[in-house]
C-alpha cells in the first residue's frame, strides 16, 4: 500500500485503505503521538469513526426500507406516513443512541490505552446497526 504523498497509481488496495482510513485529522504538526499514522488514537477520532459508520450503515438500511414502504403504501390514507417514520428513525436513532454508544466504545478504547484501526471502527459502527436491525426484525421488545 502506498503512503499519502507518494503520488503513484494506488490500485484497488490503495483505494480500500483510503475508504477505510477516514482521514479524520491530519497527523502533521498536531502533536498526536500515535505510532501508526492510519490508526485512530484520540477519543474524538475513535468516537467520530464509529459514529460515522453507525450512521451511514443505518441510513443504508433504512432508506431502501422507507422507499419500499412509500411505494407499497402510496394509496393508503395513513400508511404513507409510516414510510416517513421509517426514514426518520434511520437518521434520528443513530444520532441519539449512536452518539452515546459510540462515545462509550471510544471511551473504553481510550481508557484501555488501545488505538483503534479504521476496520475496527467499521466493524463496531455497522455492528450497532446490525443489533438494531436484529432487535427490530425479531420483535424481541414486543414479547416483554
From Swiss-Prot:
The protein's predominant localisation is endoplasmic reticulum
Membrane-crossing residues? Answer: 51-71, 86-106, 117-137
Side of membrane Extracellular, spans: 1-50, 107-116
Which ranges make up the Cytoplasmic topological domains here?
A: 72-85, 138-144
* InterPro entries in alphabetical order: Transmembrane_pr_170
Q: Which family does it belong to?
A: Belongs to the TMEM170 family.
Q: What does this protein do?
A: Acts as a regulator of endoplasmic reticulum (ER) and nuclear envelope (NE) morphogenesis. Affects the ratio between tubular ER and ER sheets by promoting sheet formation at the expense of tubules. Influences NE expansion, nuclear pore complex formation and proper localization of inner nuclear membrane proteins.
User: What's the protein name?
Assistant: Transmembrane protein 170A
Please give the organism: Mus musculus (Mouse)
- The encoding gene is Tmem170a
